[in-house]
Amino acid sequence: MQTPTHPPSEEDRRETARLVKAVEVVYEDDDLIAFNKPTGLLIAPDRWDRDRLNLMRVIHERWSPEYFNAHRLDRDTSGLVLCAKTRATLTALCRLFEKGAIVKRYRALVRGAPPERAGLVRARVVPDRFHPGRMCVGRPGKRAETRYEVVKAWRGFTMLRCEPLTGRTHQIRVHLAHVGCPILGDAFYGDGRGLMLSEIKRRYRHGADAERPLIGHLALHAESLTFEHPADGRAMEITTPPPRAFDLAVRYLDRFAG
């Protein structure tokens, strides 16, 4: 059953325009094209709301209806999405993803710290029967492995580089929460809070207006893809930097939580 639609508000229209503008090409050749997806944008149409804005609709309207995404990101995860320009390339890319031949690296800003500077989380992931749409660590579940390393650490917060070795739903988010360092802004597997300046700055003075977070969205970014090009086998590494909110958060953490 499709959710009833209502005329979009002015705020909704502004947000839609912002998301559309934020989609950008990171790499392109004759066979494939990579986009930088902003946080808050679905990859594909919502099954309950077909009119909801999604990345593939933006791509089909702004670039070509013949492009196909070879993998997915969560709505609130920003970063690289690799698309094929032909069915043959799509088949080849999907095969590479299924074989684990495409190395995916993510940047995550978390609350707390993992147990080690670098490590491997091995924990089976299963749908959470108490919270539909969420996952949790449990058995029998599916095998899931995530490699991580500390990029930078502050009092109470850590920047991690993560590499999922399997491709389970919400895998990085579940695994980081499991080892005690949920991602900032994660309402499913953490407390949903972003980074507030008042948390890290001593004698912070609250103004008349409500404080806005330095980073208020899910602080998880798909920053690189490494693979062999399906057309000629040449080594490929496509990268894109995190959103500006990451840089802002790091700047204030360096200043007040170093």
Question: What do the predicted segments below correspond to?
Answer:
Residues 31, 142, 156, 168, ...:
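Short acidic/polar mixed-charge low-complexity motifs
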Residues 198-203, 252-258:
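Short, surface-exposed secondary-structure junctions/capping segments
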Residues 52, 155-225, 242, 246-247:
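Pseudouridine synthase
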Residues 79-80, 234-236:
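Short active-site oxyanion
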Residues 1-145, 152-154, 176, 241-257:
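RNA pseudouridine synthases
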